[in-house]
Amino acid sequence: MAILKICTYPDPVLRKETVAITVFDEKLVKLTEDMAETMYDAPGIGLAAPQIGESLKLVVVSTARREDSKQEYMVMANPEIVEKEESQVDEEGCLSVPELLAMVKRYRKIKVNYQDINGEPCSMTVEDRFAVVLQHEIDHLNGILFLDHLSSLKRNLYKKKVKKWFLPR
């Protein structure tokens, strides 16, 4: 397994359209293992393929119950939210949007159709924090960053901060 480079805002790969996974092979297994290792190393609780420069409809999410527990994760290929209920506001951060935490409004309960690592169709209904994580990661597959859910004022403040990081000293 390998730790991959995480792409950060404003890298254009984060906005690219992703393509569906159609081949479920050892290469995909290796990619998801590397993604999981990268996610836990960061540390994070979810990672989408665009965040490591791959324009694929693929996410890995931690299923560990506590931070100190075994590194368990699930793979979701071609995930799609098919049902959503209620809303909630929760604090989010993103490995691709460093140094920013913000309150974001998301659905409280969602149903997601996806394929597992073997290409088998699956469906899952989740709520609360896990629903937030899945919505966040699925947004990445559509070129949407959690930054896009913020007010224009907060977005612009963050953009100014990022520009300063790249100015010559």
UniProtKB/Swiss-Prot annotation:
Q: Name one GO biological process term.
A: co-translational protein modification
Q: What is its EC number?
A: 3.5.1.88
List the Gene Ontology MF annotations in alphabetical order: metal ion binding; peptide deformylase activity
* Protein name according to UniProt: Peptide deformylase
Chain residues that bind Fe cation:
94, 136, 140
**The organism of origin for this protein:** Desulfotalea psychrophila (strain LSv54 / DSM 12343)
This enzyme catalyses: N-terminal N-formyl-L-methionyl-[peptide] + H2O = N-terminal L-methionyl-[peptide] + formate
Family per record: Belongs to the polypeptide deformylase family.
Q: How and how many cofactors are bound, per the record note?
A: Binds 1 Fe(2+) ion.
This chain is encoded by the gene named def
**PANTHER family (alphabetical):** PEPTIDE DEFORMYLASE
